[in-house]
Amino acid sequence: MANFKGHALPGSFFLVFGLWWSVKYPLKYLNSKVKGNCRSNKCYERLELIEGILKAAFALIGILAEQFVPDGPHMHLVNGEDHSWVKLMNWQHTTMYLFYGISGVVDILTFLPLNLPRGLDRLSLGIAVIIEGLLFYYHVHNRPALDQHIHSLLLIAVFGGAISIMIEVFMRNDIVLELFRSSLTILQGTWFWQIGFVLYPLGGAPEWDQTDHGNVMFITMCFCWHYAVALLIMAINYSLVYCCVKRHKKLSSVVDNSLKKINSNKTEVEASLLAGSDEE
């Protein structure tokens, strides 16, 4: 959709997943340091299955929104009367959602007893991100300078994420790569919203001069600020997760010590009773 909603929708999807990953991966990493956490591993597997279902569902919502909004193409690619293309921008967004939907389906299939190759889920996600970058690279040709520039900045986050994910195919459970991907996903989410506010101002706000080089300079600086905020969010979430895990570990240790003490006292009582019965 060539409007504010068309950028807010994918921005919201990326933001939700980026924020979720910024909590999930630190939690998984810090819990992996605790011995005997088999139950947690099963829990994470279920969470990743749910994540795949949500990814496929979000992609389906995006496809339906792009195709069946009042001014959408309604699944028509070519106009039958003059043989012209119909709403190609909507079709590009639909294609992006399609590949993210495929990634979600692969995530789901990974947890079925099909013996799929290890890393296939990351590979499918990496392909989806590459397709997104390819589509947006040719999305704004022959458009005003500011429009081209603000979308080209998005490609930094897109292809940076794609490289990270492709490395994850071979290096699973690497916390640095996972956190890097999470930060770039948050950046994508906030930047989609920023594109919407710049190109389609709300509430009668003044329009941006698309040819002013000063605006191009500010948008570049603004992109760096967005990533700084993303890194701050990552740091805050990691710190909160660390405190929660540390507190939980401390409580578990207290409970374990209490149980050991109770069992020890119980053993001593039983031993004294047995000793008393032997004397009789």
Swiss-Prot record:
UniProt key word Cytoplasm: no
Stored PANTHER family: EPIDIDYMAL MEMBRANE PROTEIN E9-RELATED (PTHR16007), TRANSMEMBRANE PROTEIN 45B (PTHR16007:SF59)
GO CC annotations on file: membrane
Transmembrane intervals: 7-27, 49-69, 96-116, 120-140, 150-170, 184-204, 216-236
Protein name, entry field: Transmembrane protein 45B
Family statement drawn from the similarity comment of this UniProt entry: Belongs to the TMEM45 family.
Protein keywords: Membrane, Transmembrane, Transmembrane helix
Topology within the bilayer: Multi-pass membrane protein
Species of provenance: Xenopus tropicalis
Compartments (UniProt record): Membrane
